[in-house]
A protein has these predicted regions:
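N-terminal ligand-binding/catalytic initiation module
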Residues: 1-122
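Glycine-rich phosphate/diphosphate-binding loop of Rossmann-like nucleotide-binding domains
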Residues: 41, 46-66, 124, 132-171
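Acidic, His- and aromatic-enriched active-site or binding-groove loops in soluble protein domains
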Residues: 127
Length: 171
């Protein structure tokens, strides 16, 4: 089954029912980690090649903590149209898309558009991952001091991808 002629039956089955690509291939366990290198950690716009070590590190975390295979895709474009087109054309090879270190405000449009055109989960880590961690930390801190979230005011400093998403998640 590793190669011809054994792969013909799965190929024909997927042709008839494309959703079988998730069970008859590695697709369901493969995530693309996508960046344009414009908001890499605290380093800023360092470019896609310089962002590769971070993307490789994220791929290693996927493997170590979830046994998910991940592949870095560092795109040499800051144009949302080109990024969306490139990722959407490659989406058939993956079970999910993890957007990483793409600067605001373009990251919002890119994520939204990819969610509209891809039939797999699309997640911008800098927005939602950070917001979930902040929400968990806030709820735990409130539990420690014995307060309800309705009793406090929360200040968010920054209006980048993380700050805006934190605000949206806390509302």
């Amino acid at each position: 089954l590793a190669y011809t002629p054994g792969v013909a039956p799965p190929c024909l089955a997927i042709q008839e029912q494309p959703e079988l690509s998730f069970t008859l291939t590695r697709r369901s366990n493969l995530v693309a980690v996508v960046t344009d290198g414009t908001a890499v950690l605290g380093l800023g716009d360092i470019g896609p090649e310089a962002g590769m070590p971070v993307m490789e590190g994220k791929c290693a975390l996927f493997k170590a903590f979830a046994d998910v295979d991940a592949f870095p895709l560092c795109i040499r474009s800051k144009d949302p149209d080109e990024i969306v087109r490139t990722v959407s054309l490659l989406a058939g090879s993956f079970g999910g898309i993890n957007l990483e270190d793409i600067a605001a405000p373009r990251c919002f449009e890119i994520e939204r558009r990819l969610q509209e055109v891809c039939d797999i989960p699309v997640f911008h880590d800098d927005q939602h991952g950070t917001a979930v961690v902040v929400a968990a930390a806030l709820l735990n801190a409130l539990r420690v001091v014995g307060k309800d979230i309705g009793q406090v005011r929360t200040v968010i400093s920054g209006a980048g991808a993380a700050g805006i998403s934190i605000g949206r998640h806390l509302l």
